[in-house]
Amino acid sequence: MQERHTEQDYRALLIADTPIIDVRAPIEFEQGAMPAAINLPLMNNDERAAVGTCYKQQGSDAALALGHKLVAGEIRQQRMDAWRAACLQNPQGILCCARGGQRSHIVQSWLHAAGIDYPLVEGGYKALRQTAIQATIELAQKPIVLIGGCTGSGKTLLVQQQPNGVDLEGLARHRGSAFGRTLQPQLSQASFENLLAAEMLKTDARQNLRLWVLEDESRMIGSNHLPECLRERMTQAAIAVVEDPFEIRLERLNEEYFLRMHHDFTHAYGDEQGWQEYCEYLHHGLSAIKRRLGLQRYNELAAQLDTALTTQLTTGSTDGHLAWLVPLLKEYYDPMYRYQLEKKAEKVVFRGEWAEVAEWVKAQ
């Protein structure tokens, strides 16, 4: 059984999306995990806490004995069955615990006794995490071109279509605005950073990468924030601004926020609950900027939203949403973005409609 322990080995694991059987407790996994990891813990949260307390009070031998006592009999067999199935399903995978210590070695030895030889990550999650952090710092040093533009300019799609593009909003599972949430919950900060590092490593490995194409994001994307090393480089980057006609932007926003989100909610929850979730999603987005709109304007737009939802429910048409979306763009989102862009006007190197910006980016 060959353990992986060099920096290049760790990077290769992330680039290849090597399946990782992570045997840490669920609470540890939730705080941060690698993108291709599945959590099949040796100990659950309560068992881990009990062993930790025993270690502090009575030392390592007593803690180890308690661990074996807690994970025995039927409990051990159930977990063995899960590990065995995961190993057979992922023959190219590896075991991982916090630091490549006792937990992954214990699981490895139990599997070996059952006739399965399976490698483990020397250094564990901590080593992989440090590799992810270091890779992001290193790769962020390459030149960056940012795609800017008002809401509905199709920036994310443009980034997605570039071989050197990294979709930060897709990785964050959030579109960055008050209406930006998706049906997927956002990852923990560490897991988001690990996913970003893996995506940058994979993108870099596929080509002789000269520069990154990223969307012009603020520091926060929902509850996730960009790594400081990347954010700092983005503040210095050249910006290409998409300037599409207002009507085209409205078509994109109608497709993305009304048609697609309604479809996604009903697909996930069924027609009745999906409709309620969709309505709450739109109201929550508007409510998030209530203070900036002012109470009177917020109440007016919220009433127009209710009317639009009634129309959509009875006729299927989303046209009614323009009554509140158009003023929201013209009075709030567009002025806010233009103000932000003015502060970095010297960084703007190209302006044009979507197709023109796409051609310009490809030529860089």
From Swiss-Prot:
Catalytic residue positions: 97 (s-selanylcysteine intermediate)
Keywords recorded for this protein, A-Z: Selenium, Transferase
A Pfam family reported for this protein in Swiss-Prot or TrEMBL: Rhodanese
GO MF annotation terms: transferase activity, transferring alkyl or aryl (other than methyl) groups; tRNA 2-selenouridine synthase activity
Gene3D superfamilies per UniProt: Rhodanese-like domain
EC number: 2.9.1.3
Keyword tRNA processing: no
Keyword Cytoplasm listed: no
PROSITE patterns for this protein: RHODANESE_3 (PS50206)
Domain Rhodanese intervals: 14-137
Known catalytic reactions: 5-methylaminomethyl-2-thiouridine(34) in tRNA + selenophosphate + (2E)-geranyl diphosphate + H2O + H(+) = 5-methylaminomethyl-2-selenouridine(34) in tRNA + (2E)-thiogeraniol + phosphate + diphosphate; 5-methylaminomethyl-2-thiouridine(34) in tRNA + (2E)-geranyl diphosphate = 5-methylaminomethyl-S-(2E)-geranyl-thiouridine(34) in tRNA + diphosphate; 5-methylaminomethyl-S-(2E)-geranyl-thiouridine(34) in tRNA + selenophosphate + H(+) = 5-methylaminomethyl-2-(Se-phospho)selenouridine(34) in tRNA + (2E)-thiogeraniol; 5-methylaminomethyl-2-(Se-phospho)selenouridine(34) in tRNA + H2O = 5-methylaminomethyl-2-selenouridine(34) in tRNA + phosphate
GO biological process, one term: tRNA wobble uridine modification
Subunit structure: Monomer.
Protein task: Involved in the post-transcriptional modification of the uridine at the wobble position (U34) of tRNA(Lys), tRNA(Glu) and tRNA(Gln). Catalyzes the conversion of 2-thiouridine (S2U-RNA) to 2-selenouridine (Se2U-RNA). Acts in a two-step process involving geranylation of 2-thiouridine (S2U) to S-geranyl-2-thiouridine (geS2U) and subsequent selenation of the latter derivative to 2-selenouridine (Se2U) in the tRNA chain.
Family as reported in the entry's similarity comment: Belongs to the SelU family.
Protein name: tRNA 2-selenouridine synthase
Species lineage: Bacteria, Pseudomonadati, Pseudomonadota, Gammaproteobacteria, Enterobacterales
Encoding gene per record: selU
